[in-house]
Amino acid sequence: MAWDSSNRPGEPEQNQVIAMTSGKGGVGKSTLCVLLGLGDALRGKRVLLIEFDAGLRGLDLMLGIADQVVYDLGDLLEGRCTISKAVMESPLHENLNAIVAPVSLEAPMDLSDVQLLIDGLRGHFDRLILDMPAGLGFSSKIAGCTADIALIAVTPDPVCVRDGAKMAQTLEKQGLCRHRLLINRVEEKMLRRAVLMDLDAVIDGVGSQLLGVFPYAEEIPLRLSRGLQLKGNHPVLRIAQAVSRRLDGEYVPLVFP
């Protein structure tokens, strides 16, 4: 079992730019981005979420800014607006901001333009969280040239675990060998009945060190899809803050659902 023992006291690591990836869609990747962003924000960090899934915008709804968006990532990369025009502050927390994806993809994003943008944003935010499209190609290329670390989001089922392993291998081919695992939608009673894979088997199957485990909580995506706030003491936010601290190099015991 590949427990993450690399983050110990006195060994902080540079994890300012995080790429949230997944081998397949439907694993709750964007929800995890918002939760991790809130976990960072609650710890006093200034956070920027950047959504790359052109044509499938969703963060605007989850962050409660759908009615306020004028400019998006496509506008920014094409030079139609400044960074200050594209960055939107979320009402969920004053430290939480976002640049949302284009509603349609007019032209493929240029990797060099994306890299210049991310490099320019590093000095303005404590954490940049890149919400990548599902799949192996485009996501791994952007992560490889911009991110300090990639998080691989999976659910505990064999298909998702196999695709997560492919994502880990693809990231390494792109030169990003620092990746960690987030297991989402874990339901204890399903684990007991062996309907879902054992968490040890998930970790070994993906081949990435475990960073955090999030429970199956149907109300979370429902609330976030309406831009509704979560209480600061909600269990998933405690998990998100623990993940945030581990990313900062603190030795924090894994928080389980």
Task: Name each region found by the language model.
Residues 52-123, 220-229:
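P-loop/Walker-type NTP enzyme "switch/lid" segment
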Residues 137-158:
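Inter-motif core of Ras-like GTPase G domains
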Residues 16-82:
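Walker A/P-loop NTP-binding active-site region of P-loop NTPases
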Residues 1-17, 173, 246, 250-257:
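Acidic-aromatic/histidine active-site loop/patch
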Residues 224-240:
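C-terminal boundary of histidine-terminating zinc-finger modules
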Residues 162-176:
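Conserved C-terminal guanine-recognition region of P-loop GTPase G domains, centered on the G4
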Residues 23, 155-156, 181-193, 213-220:
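G-domain G4 guanine-recognition motif of GTPases
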